[in-house]
């Protein structure tokens, strides 16, 4: 006994089950029956706590698979097992699914059943073995061959044996049948049949002995044939299913037990032989098709039938066996796609879609739709690339490649979207169409037509109509079988649904590929044949490429990659555009929008026309601008970048950034980076110019330029960034610049030639300067050729002069002179003015304020640095954008002088900053046209990318930046505040940051005119090597990039401040440079911002918005930073004020960088953020601990802010304290210190603004905050963004402050003094959320449509101020985000990151929604 017990205990489930099945050799049992026997006979000790049934079932499942399995799963039945060695012939036969046997059985059984009302009894006895076998099979009983008919296994009861799924389907069928039968009974009297008794008997019998089950397989087989045909396939073609049903009498629509039992003849007599699969009266409407059609019922169907049905399933759901026959895959009929297809079919059935009348109508509609318009016929090619001279083989290869890539990239995006696309196509397509602009749309349409026709040709006639309807939508095809089925089903695709589907997929793939090519090539898209053929695309690319000479070689591959990678995104886009084509009415508007939104790819695509299309593009850009202006956010975004339509292009995304998009961009960036590096090496320094990433060339080009520029500036890193931006997304750099995620794209595209040139010029100038100065090393220049090439591409010819100039300037100064690299910005005339004047602090480079012409390139030699002459470019800047610049020019000159001096002492960057600080007045020069360049600066790009850019490289540029600052600020202020601004802001990246600073400043102006602070930190960030911008570029030049650039700048500035303060030597800042630099940085930022602001306030606003969206503290920090210069101004005391400011600056920048970092991290462009964090921390390592703590303590945003503040404070403590004294330090240490610093900076900026009202007004904070008032306002703003904003606006109104104020949100009581500001800062810290609001405020500025106007008339800053004030009020609420701690997701429109609460179900951020 003991042994036996032990044996029982040790027995496994497999052994126990085998024992049971050996005891009942010919009785297949379900797991439940086996368990019953085990329990009854005590074959295994079942412990409590386990689920014996589940264990046994799992074991049976496992051991019935594969060669070694000891059990055999009886086919066609749910979970019925027998021992493999015992598998009887009958079973095997059954498993063969030979329909005859099962049909015959069911028939014989049913005939027997029907023979008498006691059919169930008769069946049992009479049928003897067969019917019993069937019954048993269905009930899982063994064949009757076994003597014990009643119950071989004690546990088995006929009823029980049925598996649950079978029961389920039976139940469903039973119900449906009952309903139908009742209906029929009412309708007709069936005299011949004792229906009621029969029914009852049958039902009972079924219940009792699952006799009906056996039949069920048969009838189910039938129905599932017809039905599954009808339901499963129905999705494909109801008519087909109907025919099937009719053709298979057995398909009886009665897969119910009843029909099982009823005689075939009887069925026919009672008219139950056919299941209605057409009308809404069908019983199938109330049947669970999933219960009807499962692998068991399916296996009962005749083989031919199964094969035919399998063709309707997606490839993944069918497997081809060794014998070449298809088999169902395990989950084919049990997945969500099939379920939704079945559901969809049922719904369509209930809606009467399959009635002959409806089918006829649908067919007619399809026929109508099929007529190809002449113009489409003209573009038709029987295979992809035919018109481009590809041979069919090449075409196949190409499409195979693309489709593969496509497949990967596209799958996620395409699968669902596609289905929906059909419906949405008209809407979303319009966007993408917009991108391509009307030309592209037409082309695309033709392409689509071609694809469609191709598909149709391939498809069978029946499928054709369906396909036509489906295909245009291009929706169902790829997504999933069920969907496809559904889609096609309504259509009369009976015969070849699958082929049609696969063809469709193929076509779609081709289509996608072609789209990809188009998109990838960007220019090619518009290219001659809108070629679907890669060659054409390449050719287009070539067209573009020439511009980008160095990158070209790489570019082509990138194009291909991009094609592949971005196919997914593009696919959607192109489909959309195709749809848009269909809806011409929408096309124009959408096209504009699209252009704005998808500038990167589309813009480049547009470039395909090369020189010709640019003009048309420009108008569209203009339209978008006007369109954008009205919208606060878009306008704001556009405003800054208005001048640089390129920026619009920035988002190459059409509204939805897809993984493919991102990947493609990354690939492109990589390739471009390589190209840029080579080019940079070749062109050694002039490449930076192309930096017109923001406004630069057409969409893509700008981005590329930007990336290239940064690459040049930072050499390898920068180059990479550039490439990232440029290549990554044709408009990535632009994207970066563009405030408007999607809004600007069209503008960019079209304005590019004109406005973009300006913006690009600005950017380029600055970037070149920065690049140069940043590179200060020849190494930096390396990427410049690439940049210039990119720029050219970007501007597509529009900025070739820029390029040339850039290159020239680049060559001019390797050491610290950014020199005239900026000059190249000629195309960007106005922007250039600003950018051109960017002087390098170390070398006061020449900044060519080539307002309108490259000629403008004033090569301010290093002399500029030495003297104010450096600002000459500024003065020269005739650019419309830079009206203020010109005034600044004098200031800039002064600033330039100051900068130059320090520049000598301090190696590039910091020295400039100190000088700036020292000579606030001279700082004016620095403010230069920095604003324009930021996006393009390679350094900036690198920073954005999160690459480590030497601080020195970046810092020198700050001077240029200062130069860039608009003189609008009072000379004194400019000197006092502006200089610091220049140093911190304009020169802000005082050394290597120069480039970055410029770029950021431009960006700031463009993106965040109200973001002096960010610029500064950004400057620091650059040194930190933080260039998330590049990454962001691809994502959303406009928002993300702007934000990132600003952040980077802020970080850099912070770093500068920190570095100068903490380690002057490290920063290479003049000794006094620390404090001075800090303050100068702030001021410079302010100036730069002002100038920039004037140039592109909208961008700034957008940027801010992004920040607020990001819920970054950096925004507020930036604001604070901006304030810093003002505060300093307020302080007035160069020593004390600047010192304090320095500390503040540092704090702010750190804060900004950290928050930026965090935010960036959040963003997909998180790179910047991450990098910033990292950067910041190292720089602010001293400050890091408190900062981080603060960070932790504050929420995400507040934490960011706190961190920045703390870090800044710490740094400040380290340096500022040194320089300024313990007050700053204490503040820095305190959470309030941060706020105070912030406020201080704001105050200084305010002072700046007040002094240089005109000048400042364009600037974010500076302009907003007249002086201390402004600063004070800012402080409260930080605390209470809205109210302060209003106040600030009022106060700033005098200066242009309000205009920026909105952005800056410097509207607090004007009386607040530095002290109060500081308190405010503390408050800010405490109100980290408040800070967030402030950031939100920045966002508010985003909508600075007026700012645009303001920009245009930099001089009339008052107006801009008002506009800004209004804007800020408007945007204030939207910009505020109260969910700072929540998870961030990416906006599908511009790629900006925000909280999912903010973005909401539309997946669009506030600014995109406003734009839409």
Swiss-Prot record:
Query: Which ranges are annotated Low complexity under compositional bias?
Result: 103-121, 139-166, 174-188, 228-241, 706-717, 876-890, 1257-1280
Renumbered to this chain, motif Nuclear localization signal spans 181-185
Q: Where is this region: Disordered?
A: 91-263, 385-621, 684-784, 814-834, 864-930, 971-998, 1125-1199, 1246-1289
Q: Where in the cell is it found?
A: Nucleus
One cellular component (GO) term of this entry: PR-DUB complex
Q: Name the major location.
A: nucleus
PROSITE patterns with a match to the protein in the record:
DEUBAD (PS51916), HTH_HARE (PS51913)
Biased composition, Gly residues: where in the chain? Answer: 688-705
Q: Which GO terms describe its biological process?
A: animal organ morphogenesis; positive regulation of transcription by RNA polymerase II
User: What keywords would UniProt list here?
Assistant: Metal-binding, Nucleus, Repressor, Transcription, Transcription regulation, Zinc, Zinc-finger
Q: Which residues form the DEUBAD domain?
A: 280-389
Q: Where is the composition biased (Basic and acidic residues)?
A: 442-459, 504-521, 1166-1178
Question: PANTHER family of this UniProt entry?
Answer: ADDITIONAL SEX COMBS LIKE PROTEIN ASXL, POLYCOMB GROUP PROTEIN ASXL2-RELATED
Outline what the protein does.
Putative Polycomb group (PcG) protein. PcG proteins act by forming multiprotein complexes, which are required to maintain the transcriptionally repressive state of homeotic genes throughout development. PcG proteins are not required to initiate repression, but to maintain it during later stages of development. They probably act via methylation of histones, rendering chromatin heritably changed in its expressibility. heritably changed in its expressibility. Involved in transcriptional regulation mediated by ligand-bound nuclear hormone receptors.
Q: What is known of its domains?
A: Contains one Leu-Xaa-Xaa-Leu-Leu (LXXLL) motif, which may be required for an association with nuclear receptors.
Q: Which family does it belong to?
A: Belongs to the Asx family.
- Name this protein carries in UniProt: Putative Polycomb group protein ASXL2
Question: Which species?
Answer: Gallus gallus
């Amino acid at each position: 006994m003991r042994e036996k017990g032990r044996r029982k205990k040790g027995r496994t489930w497999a052994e126990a089950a085998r024992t049971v099945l050996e005891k009942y050799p010919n009785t297949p049992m379900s797991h439940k029956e086996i368990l019953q026997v085990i329990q009854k006979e005590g074959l295994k000790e079942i412990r409590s706590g386990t689920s014996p049934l589940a264990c046994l079932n799992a074991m049976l499942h496992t051991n019935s698979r594969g060669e070694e399995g000891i059990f055999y799963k009886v086919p066609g039945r749910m979970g019925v097992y027998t021992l493999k060695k015992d598998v009887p012939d009958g079973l095997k036969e059954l498993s063969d699914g030979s329909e005859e046997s099962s049909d015959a059985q069911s028939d014989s059984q049913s005939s027997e059943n029907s023979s008498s009302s006691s059919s169930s009894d008769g069946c049992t006895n009479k049928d003897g073995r067969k019917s019993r076998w069937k019954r048993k099979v269905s009930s899982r009983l063994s064949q009757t061959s076994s003597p014990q008919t009643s119950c071989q296994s004690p546990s088995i009861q006929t009823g029980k044996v049925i598996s649950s799924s079978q029961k389920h389907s039976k139940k469903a069928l039973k119900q449906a049948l009952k309903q139908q039968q009742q209906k029929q009974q009412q309708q007709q009297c069936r005299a011949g049949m004792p229906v009621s008794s029969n029914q009852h008997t049958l039902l009972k019998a079924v219940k009792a002995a699952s006799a009906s089950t056996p039949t069920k397989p048969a009838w189910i087989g039938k129905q599932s044939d017809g039905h599954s045909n009808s339901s499963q396939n129905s999705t494909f073609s109801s008519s087909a299913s109907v025919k099937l049903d009719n053709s298979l009498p057995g398909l009886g629509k009665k897969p119910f037990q009843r029909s099982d039992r009823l005689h075939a003849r009887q069925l026919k007599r009672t008219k139950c032989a056919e299941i209605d699969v057409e009308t809404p009266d069908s019983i199938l409407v109330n049947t669970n098709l999933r219960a009807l059609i499962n692998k068991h019922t399916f296996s009962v169907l005749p083989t031919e039938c199964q094969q035919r049905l399998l063709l309707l399933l997606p490839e993944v759901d069918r497997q081809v066996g060794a014998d070449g026959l298809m088999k169902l895959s395990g989950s084919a009929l049990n997945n969500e796609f099939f379920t939704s297809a079945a559901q969809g079919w049922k719904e369509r059935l209930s809606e009467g879609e399959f009635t002959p009348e409806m089918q006829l109508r649908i067919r007619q509609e399809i026929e109508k739709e099929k007529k190809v318009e002449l113009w489409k016929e003209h573009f038709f090619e029987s295979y992809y690339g035919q018109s481009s001279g590809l041979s069919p083989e090449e075409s196949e290869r190409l499409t195979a490649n693309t489709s593969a890539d496509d497949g990967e990239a596209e799958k996620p995006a395409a699968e669902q979207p596609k289905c929906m696309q059909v419906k949405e196509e008209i809407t979303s397509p319009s966007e993408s169409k917009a991108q391509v602009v009307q030309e592209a749309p037409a082309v695309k349409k033709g392409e689509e037509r071609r694809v469609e026709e191709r598909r149709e040709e391939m498809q069978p006639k029946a499928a054709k109509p369906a396909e036509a309807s489906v295909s245009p939508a291009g929706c169902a095809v790829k997504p999933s079988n069920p969907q496809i089925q559904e889609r096609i089903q309504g259509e009369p695709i009976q015969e070849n649904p699958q082929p049609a589907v696969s063809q469709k997929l193929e076509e779609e793939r081709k289509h996608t590929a072609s789209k990809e090519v188009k998109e990838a090539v960007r220019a090619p898209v518009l290219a001659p044949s809108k070629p679907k053929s890669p060659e054409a695309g390449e050719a287009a690319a070539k067209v573009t490429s020439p511009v980008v000479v160095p990158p070209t070689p790489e570019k082509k591959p990138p194009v291909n990659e991009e094609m592949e990678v971005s196919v997914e995104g593009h696919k959607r886009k192109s489909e959309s555009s195709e749809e848009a084509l269909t809806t011409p009415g929408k096309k124009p508007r959408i096209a504009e929008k699209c252009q704005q939104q998808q500038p990167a790819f589309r813009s480049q695509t547009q470039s395909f026309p090369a020189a010709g299309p640019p003009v048309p593009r420009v108008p569209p850009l203009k339209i978008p601008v006007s369109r954008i202006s009205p919208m606060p956010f878009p306008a704001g975004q556009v405003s800054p970048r208005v001048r640089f339509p390129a920026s619009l292009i920035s988002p190459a995304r059409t509204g939805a950034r897809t993984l493919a998009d991102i990947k493609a961009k990354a690939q492109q960036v990589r390739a471009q980076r390589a190209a840029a590096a080579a080019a940079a090496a070749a062109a050694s320094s002039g490449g930076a110019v192309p930096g017109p990433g923001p406004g630069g060339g057409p969409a893509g080009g700008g981005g590329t330029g930007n990336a290239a520029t940064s690459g040049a500036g930072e050499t390898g890193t920068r180059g990479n960034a550039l490439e990232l931006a440029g290549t990554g997304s044709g408009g990535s750099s632009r994207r970066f610049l563009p405030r408007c995620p999607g809004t600007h794209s069209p503008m960019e595209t079209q304005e590019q030639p004109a406005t973009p040139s300006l913006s690009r010029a600005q950017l380029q100038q600055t970037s070149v300067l920065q690049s140069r100065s940043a590179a200060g090393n020849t190494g930096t220049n390396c990427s410049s050729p690439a940049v210039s090439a990119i720029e050219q591409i970007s501007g597509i010819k529009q900025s070739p002069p820029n390029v040339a100039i850039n290159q020239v300037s680049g060559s001019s100064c390797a050491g610290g002179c950014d020199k005239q690299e900026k000059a190249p910005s000629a195309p960007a005339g106005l922007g250039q003015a600003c950018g051109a004047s960017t002087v390098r602090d170390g070398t006061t480079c020449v900044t060519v304020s080539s307002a309108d012409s490259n000629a403008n390139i004033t090569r301010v030699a290093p002399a500029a640095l030495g003297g104010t002459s450096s600002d000459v470019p500024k003065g020269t800047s005739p650019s419309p954008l830079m009206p203020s610049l010109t005034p600044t020019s004098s200031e800039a000159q002064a600033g330039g002088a100051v900068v130059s001096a320090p520049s000598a002492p301090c190696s590039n960057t910091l020295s400039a900053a100190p000088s700036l600080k020292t000579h606030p007045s001279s700082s004016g020069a620095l403010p230069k046209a920095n604003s324009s360049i930021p996006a393009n600066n390679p350094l900036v790009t690198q920073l954005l990318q999160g690459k480590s850019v030497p601080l020195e490289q970046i810092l020198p540029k700050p001077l240029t930046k200062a130069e860039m600052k608009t003189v609008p600020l009072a000379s004194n202020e400019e000197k006092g505040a502006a200089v610091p601004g220049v140093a911190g802001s304009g020169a802000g990246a005082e050394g290597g940051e120069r480039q970055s600073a410029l770029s950021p400043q431009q960006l700031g102006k463009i993106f965040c005119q109200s973001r002096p602070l960010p610029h500064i930190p950004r400057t620091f960030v650059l040194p930190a090597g933080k260039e998330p911008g590049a990454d962001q570029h691809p994502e959303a030049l406009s928002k993300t990039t702007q934000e990132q650039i600003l952040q980077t700048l802020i970080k850099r500035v912070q770093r500068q401040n920190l570095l100068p303060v903490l380690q002057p030597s490290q920063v290479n800042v003049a000794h006094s440079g620390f404090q001075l630099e800090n303050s100068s940085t702030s001021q410079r930022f302010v100036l730069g911002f002002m100038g920039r602001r004037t140039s592109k306030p909208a961008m700034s606003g957008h940027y801010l918005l992004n920040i607020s969206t990001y819920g970054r503290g950096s925004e507020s920090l930036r604001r604070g930073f901006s304030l810093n210069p003002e505060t300093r101004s307020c302080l007035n005391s160069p020593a004390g004020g600047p010192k304090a400011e320095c500390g503040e600056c540092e704090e702010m920048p750190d804060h900004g960088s950290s928050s930026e970092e965090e935010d960036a991290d959040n963003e997909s462009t998180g790179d910047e953020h991450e990098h910033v964090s990292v950067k910041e921390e190292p720089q602010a390592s001293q400050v890091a601990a408190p900062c981080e703590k603060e960070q932790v303590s504050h929420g995400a945003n507040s934490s960011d802010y706190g961190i920045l503040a703390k870090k800044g404070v710490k740094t400040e403590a380290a340096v500022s304290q040194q320089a300024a004294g313990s007050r700053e330090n204490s503040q820095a240490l305190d959470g309030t210190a941060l706020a105070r610093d912030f406020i201080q900076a704001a105050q200084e900026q305010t002072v700046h603004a007040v002094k240089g009202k005109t000048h400042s007004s364009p600037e974010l904070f500076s302009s907003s905050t007249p002086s201390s008032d402004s600063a004070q306002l800012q402080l409260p703003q930080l605390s209470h963004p809205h109210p302060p904003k209003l106040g600030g606006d009022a106060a700033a109104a005098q200066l242009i402050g309000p205009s920026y104020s909105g952005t800056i949100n410097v509207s607090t009581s004007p009386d607040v003094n530095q002290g109060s500001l500081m308190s405010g800062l503390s408050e800010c810290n405490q109100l980290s959320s408040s800070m967030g609001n402030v950031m939100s405020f920045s966002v508010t500025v985003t909508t600075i449509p007026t700012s645009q106007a303001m920009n245009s008339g930099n001089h009339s800053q008052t107006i801009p101020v008002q506009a800004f004030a209004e804007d800020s009020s408007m945007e204030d609420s939207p910009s505020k985000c109260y969910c700072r701690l929540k998870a961030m997701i990416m906006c599908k429109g511009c790629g900006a990151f925000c909280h999912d609460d903010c973005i909401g179900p539309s997946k669009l951020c506030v600014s995109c929604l406003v734009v839409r």
